[in-house]
A protein has these predicted regions:
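Structured, helix-rich domain cores that form ligand/interaction pockets
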Residues: 1-306, 327-352
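Residue-level detection of the helix-turn-helix DNA-binding "recognition helix"
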Residues: 319-326
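Helix-turn-helix DNA-binding segment
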Residues: 309-319
Length: 352
């Protein structure tokens, strides 16, 4: 399933934008665990209260943190536009998302205009069906584009991340994640579906809110699908493939030198501390065969060093050379990392 959408939104509301309805804290979803402070004037008063939507679908899986409710309430909200309507299908219909989330927040006892919320985090996301499962692309992304394998969160076992505390790209096997969550029982979903998330994080909001004109949720609601796609592609190019492009095309010369390292790493894994001697031997055999042919090399080896060899000995030499050639081919001529990176880039830069 190919798709483009906003998969996470974090908003903050200042005190003058938050109005608490009477008895709000008795609405479903508010945690009974509340943080309090003490003062001589006020006694014990709440300083932080947390909210978790009791159902996921139809509520955006909303979580909220309400601070300083007694004196000057401040509100932070996080929700997933996808789950306003569906368990996993991405959406860019932020006007409908606005209506759903405005209602959910109101039913939690808080009266705010969601359009006034200041953007703190936005995840612009694409799902693409690749030619292989997403796991197979991870080594190339990790080796050549400096993506890092993500191991601290189970949902990203089959993926990797790239970026900093301001902007990140997260790539993972979407099919594996949904299957793990039990969401594919009654759904048709291609097993090669991969997800790439462009995460605009809170520490970089002073920069990206200006760059992409996403200051408030109203800016998100009024943005078009083309704008979201432009933001996503900008992240793909400038975070994921920075210094690896010439214009809109991959710069082969910026990636190709890494192919030699990848090949040598394959030999090191296969042969341990003797990998380099084996690598040189195999490369030499392949080079001689390409220059003279296998039969000519067998004849030459049979004639040198011990006189003429029997047909049996020649067959043994030929078999040994063939084994070396086949192993070299397997270790060096599988699908290249460059090919994986090229498909990754071409697929995710496409408009949906």
């Amino acid at each position: 399933m190919n798709g483009l959408g906003i998969d996470k939104v974090q908003l903050t509301f200042p005190s003058d934008a938050v109005r608490l309805r009477g008895g709000f804290n008795h609405c479903d979803g508010w945690s009974p665990k509340v943080k309090y402070m003490e003062s001589e004037e006020l006694g014990s008063y709440p300083v932080q209260r947390d909210y978790y939507s009791d159902v996921k679908l139809g509520t955006g899986n909303l979580t909220m943190v309400l601070e300083n409710e007694t004196l000057a309430p401040r509100l932070s909200t996080i929700f997933n536009p996808t789950t306003c309507f569906h368990e996993f299908a991405l959406t860019t219909d932020m006007k409908k998302v606005r209506d759903v989330m405005q209602d959910v927040i109101y039913k939690a006892g808080i009266d705010v205009d969601i359009l006034e919320g200041k953007c703190k985090r936005i995840d612009v996301t694409k799902d693409r069906i690749l030619s292989e499962k997403a796991d197979n692309y991870v080594p190339a992304l990790a080796s050549f584009l400096s993506f890092k394998r993500q191991s601290t969160k189970l949902e990203y076992d089959n993926g990797c991340t790239l970026g900093n505390q301001s902007k990140q790209l997260g790539f993972y096997n979407r099919y594996a994640k949904l299957e793990k969550d039990g969401l594919l029982k009654n759904a048709i979903f291609h097993e090669n579906t991969a997800r790439l998330e462009y995460r605009l994080l809170s520490k970089g909001k002073r920069t990206w809110t200006d760059t992409y004109n996403l200051h408030t949720f109203n800016d998100v609601v009024t943005a078009s699908m083309d704008q979201f796609n432009g933001i996503f592609v900008d992240g793909l190019k400038n975070v994921g493939l920075r210094d690896k492009l010439k214009g809109d095309e991959l710069d082969i010369n910026a990636i190709r030198p890494m192919s030699l390292i990848s090949t040598m790493q394959q030999y090191e894994t296969a042969f341990g501390r003797n990998w380099f001697q084996t690598y040189l031997k195999h490369q030499g055999i392949v080079s001689l065969v390409e220059q003279y042919s296998l039969d000519t090399l067998v004849i030459a080896l049979a004639e040198v060093g011990g006189g003429k060899q029997s047909k049996v000995e020649r067959s043994r030499i030929k078999a040994t050379l063939n084994d070396a050639i086949k192993l070299n081919t397997r270790l060096t001529q599988g699908r290249s990392s460059l090919d994986y990176i090229h498909e990754f880039y071409e697929q995710f830069k496409q408009a949906v």
